[in-house]
Amino acid sequence: MITMDNIIRDGNPTLRARAKAIEFPLSEEDKKLAHDMMEFLENSQNPEIAKKYHLRAGVGLAAPQVDVSKRMTAVLVPGIEDDDEPIFKHVLINPTILSESVQLAALGEGEGCLSVDRDIPGYVPRHDRIKLRWYDLDGNKHVERLRDYPAIVVQHEIDHLNGILFYDHINKEQPLTVPEGTIILE
């Protein structure tokens, strides 16, 4: 089981490296990693389990965050209500953004990261809509359009695969000024 102790923190060089593509068929090690990453997200969103194991809630976890430099990320965007099915729940292998909207969006409360322990205020402009290609654990190709919050989460996770952290996108001189043309998602 992955816990916060397994998640590397800002400053570790793995977080700044471009992760390597994964070959199919997946190794047993890669399958276990995929399972464990999704399990962490599920556990982190369960208040009882999160409290018991001191987990910070997360909606995404990339392999580099557990010190594995491979192009794999787990994403679990929960439904609006507790009983709702997740909006987006997948382990993405070798994900690629095929196209993106001109329209930018940012989260009103800013972004956070399991690998960054400090609060870094500022708007993180991202594309409001993306067309995403990824492979599942069996090597099947998927193409899906995402918008708003799920699109932002996936872009954050793909950044991890490219050695980019969310605060790299924040305007250093005016972090709390909304970038021109950016819509704010609350």
Swiss-Prot record:
Q: How is the cofactor bound?
A: Binds 1 Fe(2+) ion.
Which Gene Ontology molecular-function terms are recorded? metal ion binding; peptide deformylase activity
Annotated active site residues, numbered on this chain, are 157
Q: Tell me the InterPro entries matching this sequence.
A: Peptide_deformylase (IPR023635), Peptide_deformylase_sf (IPR036821)
Q: Which of the seven top EC classes does this enzyme belong to?
A: hydrolase
- Tell me the Gene Ontology biological-process terms attached to this UniProt entry: co-translational protein modification; translation
The family database entries (Gene3D superfamilies) matched by this protein are listed as: Peptide deformylase (3.90.45.10)
Superkingdom, taxonomy of origin: Bacteria
CDD domains given in the database record: Pep_deformylase
Its EC number is: 3.5.1.88
Catalysed reaction per UniProt?
Answer: N-terminal N-formyl-L-methionyl-[peptide] + H2O = N-terminal L-methionyl-[peptide] + formate
**Which sites bind Fe cation?**
113, 156, 160
SUPFAM superfamilies linked to this entry = Peptide deformylase
Q: Could you say which cofactors this protein requires? A: Fe(2+)
Identify the keywords attached in UniProt to this record, alphabetized: Hydrolase, Iron, Metal-binding, Protein biosynthesis
The entry's family comment says: Belongs to the polypeptide deformylase family.
Q: Which NCBIfam families match?
A: pept_deformyl
Function, in words? Removes the formyl group from the N-terminal Met of newly synthesized proteins. Requires at least a dipeptide for an efficient rate of reaction. N-terminal L-methionine is a prerequisite for activity but the enzyme has broad specificity at other positions.
Q: What is this protein called?
A: Peptide deformylase
Task: Tell me what organism the protein belongs to.
Answer: Ligilactobacillus salivarius (strain UCC118)
| Record gene name | def
